[in-house]
UniProtKB/Swiss-Prot annotation:
The lineage of its organism: Archaea, Methanobacteriati, Methanobacteriota, Stenosarchaea group, Methanomicrobia. NCBIfam families: PRK04302.1, tim. The keyword Isomerase applies. Pathway: Carbohydrate biosynthesis; gluconeogenesis; Carbohydrate degradation; glycolysis; D-glyceraldehyde 3-phosphate from glycerone phosphate: step 1/1. It comes from Methanoculleus marisnigri (strain ATCC 35101 / DSM 1498 / JR1). This is Triosephosphate isomerase.
Length: 222
């Protein structure tokens, strides 16, 4: 990816639902146009269709299940995510962990449907294992720093560098994102300087009084 990538996970925060989700999406669209950065969002599943059709930004599902069409009540069907207009999906977020077999099956299903894949990992070893599955992105997020307000870029830059090297050693075509506590342009710049193509983040944007201002700051040093 040539342009830096900022992916905002709205999770199930109240601040990321309904009209609030639209406010964040509109802010992402505005800042992306101004900066040239690619800013995507991962909204709740019920928001995938409106977000995908109303805004000129990439929209990702927060999860898919390793299933095919059939009797799977309550599961997230990859085909349904694609039909809703999503560009891609998160897989194996620390709040929705999967087995390695299911991660692989999800990546294969997404590839068949031309959905981009962002496989989340928690250290350099799991990053290397994920890279072997040939996703589009591996996103390294130390779970202890997620939502902590302490940036991985400052608290543990070594894990970013090790993960980038581990992924490149397995498959240099896989892009690397990092996340956990990302909250400023300085955090993003450090991550990019260490070899990532961008960041995955949530609360610093979703819970902000002014998401547009935060997004503008996040890309300000790129």
């Amino acid at each position: 990816m040539d342009s830096p990538f900022v992916l905002v996970n709205l999770k199930t925060y109240q601040e990321g639902m309904g009209s609030n989700a639209h406010r964040i999406a509109a802010a992402a669209e505005t800042v992306a146009k101004e900066s040239g950065a690619v800013i995507g969002i991962a909204p709740a599943f019920t928001e995938l269709h409106p977000m995908s059709h109303h805004y000129a930004i990439p929209v990702y599902a927060q999860h898919i299940d390793a299933i095919t069409p059939g009797a799977h009540t309550g599961h997230i069907l990859p085909e349904a995510v694609r039909s809703a207009g999503a560009r891609g999906t998160l897989i194996n977020h620390s709040e929705r962990r999967l087995t390695l077999a299911d991660i692989g099956a999800c990546v294969e299903s997404a590839r068949r449907l031309h959905l981009e894949t962002v496989v989340c990992t928690n250290n350099d070893a799991t990053s290397a294992a994920a890279a072997a599955l040939r996703p589009d992105y591996v996103a390294i997020e130390p779970p202890e720093l997620i939502g902590s307000g302490v940036s991985v870029s400052k608290a543990d830059p070594g894990i970013i560098e090790r993960s980038v090297n581990a992924v490149r050693a397995v498959n240099p075509d896989v892009n690397v994102l990092t996340g956990a506590g990302i909250q400023s342009g300085e955090c993003v710049k450090i991550a990019v300087d260490l070899g990532t193509c961008g960041v995955l983040l949530a609360s610093s944007v979703v819970k902000a009084d002014d998401p547009e201002a935060v997004l503008r700051d996040l890309v300000s040093l790129l």
